[in-house]
């Protein structure tokens, strides 16, 4: 498999798509008016957001494939591999693209909080599907950025462009919250699977051999990206995925402590702790009592 093609700058994107560069660090493109692109895998040094206006080909993102549907928003952060199955074909995308270099937001409020927009780390099959009304809001944000790009660059340009990008991202947070709500029944099934996964893990020897399962491990077992999985669990339970796993471990630990034939050290090793003192400290942080104190209070 060939190495992915690197996209190094906004100017490169504009040149390859046959568009004029109005600002070296940011661009909004009408895909239907741009040159076709080669079907290949890409890795980008810039942030890329795509709004699709109609159904198009199958997109490959990481290890997964996704049938890119109409009214879909896809967010790609620098360093992520995306694209199509490799071929010599040229395709004509439709919809819109927003591209901005990290240097545009460096030192700004958005630059400091960009990592909080966790959907940049979602898998492509977890893309955002928007309604017609939401699409109009997205295009309004894009058009405000386009207006600033058409305006001669002055001391206000960067502030106004970045603030409109941030507003668009904040709207996207709202739209994702709506999508989480409308897919609640699907997410309940994920939580049921998560609970079953933890039960099986804790009942096996994995806990003693491998230690506590990580959020990434659980997400992979459920065919979700860690960020999407974490956001899903947080919205459905009010707890982070890590907190949920730890609470499950505490439940198992409490059951073990009830068995007075087992020492605290035995329980600690069985639960995957290398040192009993680490287990005692962890248990006390979570419960407010040491394992021995908890055992005495119940007996």
Predicted regions and their residues:
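Short hydrophobic/aromatic patch on the recognition helix
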Residues: 71, 229, 278-279, 283
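Generic protein-terminus/edge-of-domain signal
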Residues: 1-67
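A short, Lys/Arg-enriched amphipathic alpha-helix from helix-turn-helix/homeodomain DNA-binding modules
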Residues: 162, 184-222, 243-262
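…primarily DNA-binding HTH/wHTH and HhH modules…
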Residues: 280-299
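Terminal helix-turn-helix DNA-binding modules in bacterial transcription factors
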Residues: 235-274, 296-299
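An amphipathic alpha-helical interaction segment
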Residues: 136-199
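A hydrophobic/aromatic-rich effector-binding and dimerization subdomain
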Residues: 87-153
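Conserved metal-binding segment of the jelly-roll/cupin
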Residues: 68-82, 99-102
């Amino acid at each position: 498999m060939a190495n992915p093609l690197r996209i190094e700058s906004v100017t490169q994107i504009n040149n390859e798509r046959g568009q004029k560069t109005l600002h070296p660090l940011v661009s909004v493109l009408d895909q239907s008016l741009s040159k076709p692109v080669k079907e290949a895998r890409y890795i980008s040094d810039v942030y890329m957001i795509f709004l699709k206006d109609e159904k198009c080909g199958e997109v490959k993102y990481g290890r997964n494939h996704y049938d890119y549907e109409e009214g879909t928003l896809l967010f790609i952060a620098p360093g992520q591999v995306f694209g199509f199955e490799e071929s010599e074909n040229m395709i004509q995308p439709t919809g819109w693209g927003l591209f901005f270099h990290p240097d545009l937001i460096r030192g700004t409020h958005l630059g400091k909080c960009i990592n909080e927009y966790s959907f940049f780390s979602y898998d492509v099959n977890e893309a955002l599907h928007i309604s017609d009304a939401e699409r109009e809001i997205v295009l309004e944000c894009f058009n405000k950025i386009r207006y600033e790009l058409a305006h001669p660059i002055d001391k206000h340009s960067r502030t106004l462009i970045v603030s409109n990008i941030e507003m668009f991202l904040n709207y996207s947070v709202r739209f994702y919250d709506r999508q989480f709500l409308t897919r609640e029944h699907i997410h309940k099934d994920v939580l049921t699977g998560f609970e079953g996964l933890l039960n099986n893990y804790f009942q096996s020897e994995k806990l003693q051999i491998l230690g506590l399962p990580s959020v990434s491990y659980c997400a992979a077992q459920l065919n979700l990206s860690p960020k999407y999985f974490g956001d899903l669990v947080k919205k459905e339970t009010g707890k982070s995925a890590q907190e949920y796993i730890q609470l499950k471990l505490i439940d198992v630990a409490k059951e073990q402590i009830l068995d007075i034939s087992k020492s605290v050290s035995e329980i600690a090793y069985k639960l995957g702790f290398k040192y009993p003192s680490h287990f005692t400290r962890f248990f006390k942080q979570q419960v407010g009592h040491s394992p021995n104190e908890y055992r005495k209070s119940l007996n």
